[in-house]
Amino acid sequence: MKLKRILTTLTTAALITSAVALSPSATAQEEGETKLGLNALTNVLNVAEYQFDSNLADFDILTYLALDVMGAKPNSAVWALADGNVKMTAFLPTDRAFKKLVKALTGTSYVRERKIYLAVRALGFDTVEKVLLYHVVLGAPILSEAAVAANGADLTTAEGSTIRVAFDGTTLRLRDKDTKRINPNVILTRVDINEGNNQVAHTINGVLLPKLG
């Protein structure tokens, strides 16, 4: 599937989701129940206008990798990021997080985002898909306050294995299955992205790794 086709598909899906959100049946809610919005995380990632740049604090590499998997695997669960009806919490690694991962894996510290992206992409679509799904927890969105209160809890990811929440009073850390590298931290100044919708996200400073190979 070509990139243009993927973007067209995502744009169409966003329009349909918006229409559903505005329909009378969608706005009807149970008494006392808060109705969450349907804005998908692909809109937050801005898939229509993303590009490599010098800003390592954003999500360009993550966006490219997600679109790669969507293109290579039309039935991948990664597509759920584009479906605002699917409730989830996603932990989003920054471009700098991928830079640290590539350096740890290859010993090379790339400056340009494109080279970092290509190094991760070289792991193969199956591995990239597995890693991306390991950053997604399906179910009711978990806001940062609840995450902090969930110290010691194991969260089951869309990949199938778990990540453990660890909060020491100042740092919110996510413990993955990789025992060789430092566990990622949640960047507490960049949490609750897309709050009020079925899909929320929190920024992390490292890439979560499931068991690979």
Report residues per predicted region.
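Mature, structured domains of secreted/extracytosolic soluble proteins
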Residues: 5, 25-213
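C-terminal segment of classical bacterial N-terminal signal peptides
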Residues: 17-25
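Repetitive helical segments and hydrophobic/amphipathic motifs
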Residues: 13-14, 153
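Bacterial N-terminal signal peptides that target proteins for export
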Residues: 1-11
